[in-house]
Amino acid sequence: ILYHWRVHENSTAASSGSKTYTVQSGKKALEAHLSRMNIKGKVYEAEFAPNFFKIEYDLFKTPLVSIVIANKDHKEDLKRCLDSLKKSSYKNYEIIIVENNSSDNEIFEYYSEITKDGNIRVVNWRETGFNYSSINNLGVRESKGEYIILLNNDTEVINDNWIEELLSIAQFDNVGIVGAKLYYPDDTIQHAGVVIGMLGI
């Protein structure tokens, strides 16, 4: 297939600024689609480029969300993670920390401190070695929430509405799992999702 891209000074192919009405037209088209599908949400123009849009879906309900965090030692990492969670605008959540073979007394003292908060529990994975799947499965079994978030202990939440963002997609019947964009400390992207359905995966 030979494809030619025609660039004209009065065309959006050269610059979106030449036809600014296309932004509003795109926004209205998405709003009309939501209305036809009987889905409640707001359409916003993306900040990074013109004629790109973000849909913020309304939550159907506010279910309990269980946040499972596997942890071994590393008090400072865990503390940073938990401190960032406190900034979350979504409040109906519980935290299950799966302790796996820590040897530093400092972390156990920290556990005693944080479990005074009613929505934080520590459960013990008592097997030897390291099995990340088994550790997380224990946390899931101990969870009471309708939705589960698997979170690394060295993660720091940077957007206070992060739980709402995940829920707004996960709540649809045709969605089984939702991933988040992760950044390194220097703001480069560490992870931006996994594509499934290719090569039989």
Question: What does each model-found stretch correspond to?
Answer:
Residues P63-V68, E94:
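Cell-envelope/extracellular polymer assembly enzymes that use nucleotide-activated donors
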